[in-house]
Amino acid sequence: MDIFAEITPRTKSDSGQDLWVFGKRPLLALLIILTPFLKGCQETQQPSSSNYPKILCTTQMIAEPVRKLLPPEFQVEHLMGSGVDPHLYKPTPEDLRKILRADLVLYHGHHLEGRMSDMLSQLEASSPGTKVVAICEKIPQEQLIIDPSGVIDPHLWLDVTLWKDVCAQLKMTLTKHGDLSPVELEARYNTLIQELDQLHQAVLTALNPIPLERRVLVTAHDAFAYF
């Protein structure tokens, strides 16, 4: 795919110079162009005060278990705040800087992040210093909900049991990054799984009194199939 194919001169300025108009993939093109420059700026102008890797998550759903798995010394950020629709999210220039400065970028995948997913999936090839992982794509597809057209439902966190599998993948990924004690990581993981088990039991306790014939959920978005 030629990412520059849609960056073309469309019109002329008053002085007769070409005015360049960006098409569908401007952020990806700019990201690839600016990667070496921004990485260099980071190294020369912003020396790190910590030897711990910088971990960037697209959503709070991923960031929360990552923070529980890691000691507080680790730098964990997420891009999208509460109430943001990840399908429609458009990264800002500051987001792009954070992505390029991160040692590890974690995102859902399965196009939950919309067109941002395409940018992230190609980032690793253009910026070898940044590791990018679509964490939910590591779950076997036979465990996922797939509609007749072959589209995968990406809202895995609404099934607590399935989200435990995602957390296991997070643990495996984090094991490969940073100076982290395997014993401490395993202990934190076990605590996280206990919390998720308690949450799952609380959900069952809340739903069990509802008769099967009355378990109907009316929602404005098709995000609750796993629930």
Indicate residue ranges for each PLM-predicted region.
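Bacterial N-terminal signal peptides
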Residues: P26-K39
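Bacterial N-terminal signal peptides that target proteins for export
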Residues: F4-L27
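Extracytoplasmic metal-acquisition and chelation regions
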Residues: F37-F227
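Enrichment for repetitive, rod-forming helical segments
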Residues: Q17-L19, L31-I32, R115
